[in-house]
Amino acid sequence: MKLGYACINMQLSYPTKYGDKPKGTESITTGRSMIKRTFESKGVDYASEITLANAKDLHNIMTWNVLNGYNFYRMTSGLAPWKTEYEWNDLKDIKEIKQWLHSAGTMANTHGVRVTSHPGPFNVLVSPNENVVENTFQDLTMHGDVFDFMGLSRTHYNKINIHCNGVYGDKEFAMDRFC
């Protein structure tokens, strides 16, 4: 059995509350993000800075997981905020982001840590709304890209769980859309 957890390491995210660190200790988290208004005003360069900080901390979290015997980790879906609005190569820090992600992936692969992700409920492949389906493809592609940057195997061992959600009044039609 592999012991693990989903997304937020409470001890690292809140080191003074759940850990043994003094006040003022910086949290380690991959959940940094921004609201749309901030993205619109600060742009892709700020998204790059956030993504880089998240990638560095993913490495720190993976190191902590290995040192503490956690062999399963479900990654955040928010590693790269507003990723559907830009391409990876638009990020000024993409080279360093990829290096940190690869380092985290190497740590996981070397120590047998199973890494998965679970994109949010707004990703709906069976939606009758083509925009929703297209956005879902973009988001799932982003998750796959991150796994590729990490060097994770493309197997069931490193899953990207997806929501099927809703039949929209016609189960057969929804199944056809999904399959």
Sequence positions of predicted segments:
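Alpha/beta catalytic barrel-like cores
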Residues: 1-114, 123-134, 144-145, 149-152
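Conserved, mostly hydrophobic/aromatic
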Residues: 118
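Eukaryote-skewed repeat-based solenoidal scaffolds used as protein-protein interaction platforms
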Residues: 134, 140-179
